[in-house]
A protein has these predicted regions:
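Catalytic Walker B motif of ABC-type/P-loop ATPase nucleotide-binding domains
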Residues: 106-109
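Conserved ABC ATPase signature
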Residues: 81-85, 89
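Conserved ABC transporter NBD signature motif
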Residues: 11-22
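Helix-to-loop junction immediately C-terminal to a conserved catalytic motif
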Residues: 3
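Conserved ABC ATPase "signature" region
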Residues: 58-76
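A short, proline-enriched helix->beta-strand linker immediately N-terminal to the Walker B motif
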Residues: 100-104
Length: 199
């Protein structure tokens, strides 16, 4: 509902002061990329540019090439189909498509899922670089504690079908809810916090 893909069951979602008509202002990266298998990477990125902005295919392909470069993919990746890509390349291609319309807000669903620790750390750094360079608001869903500690300014914890807390990571981690304590202070949580403290 937040990204505008589903209607809310109750109430309304307001983004940038509007409840509708913000599709051009947001980019979405789906957990598994959701690239069209019959289109090349370049065509996947150019598609929303052509459809939503009415730009010519030639110009859209030029813009797509820039987005490909921004995400660290080699230029020749634009001519590949999703089936030809590694998991990390799919994430970057999907991120390039999410950036296609120069959004103000990026919605990312499990952006580091399926990546090895080195690839996930590289992706986190890429997200932070893009966020800072383009003044993006990044809204992400993740279970990756390293990503939380590396890339998040504020955290909302959802458990038992409700929001338990929304605050900075330090405040969230200190919350006295049993589930939160287990999540943030278990072995993986402690390792992620230690790693973040060393960085």
């Amino acid at each position: 509902s937040i990204a505008g893909l589903l209607q809310p069951k109750a109430g309304q979602v307001t983004i940038l002061g509007k409840s509708t008509g913000v599709a051009r202002n947001i980019g979405v990266l789906f957990q598994r990329g959701a690239l069209f298998s019959s289109l090349t990477v370049q065509e996947n990125i150019a598609l929303p540019i052509i459809e939503l902005l009415g730009i010519s295919r030639k110009k859209a392909n030029q813009i797509a090439a820039v987005k490909i470069a921004l995400t660290g993919l080699p230029a020749q990746a634009g001519e590949l189909y999703p089936a030809d890509l590694s998991g990390g390349m799919i994430k970057r291609a999907a991120l390039a498509r999410a950036l296609a319309l120069d959004p103000e807000i990026l919605f990312l669903d499990e952006p580091t899922a399926g990546l090895d620790p080195i690839g996930a750390a590289d992706f986190d750094r890429l997200l932070m670089t893009l966020r800072d360079a383009f003044h993006l608001t990044v809204f992400l869903i993740t279970h990756d504690l390293d990503t939380l500690y590396t890339a998040c300014d504020r955290v909302a914890v959802l458990s038992q079908k409700k929001v338990l807390v929304v605050d900075t990571l330090d405040v969230v981690a200190a919350t006295q809810d049993e589930w939160i304590k287990e999540y943030f202070h278990g072995p993986r949580g402690r390792a992620a916090a230690l790693s973040a403290a060393k960085a």
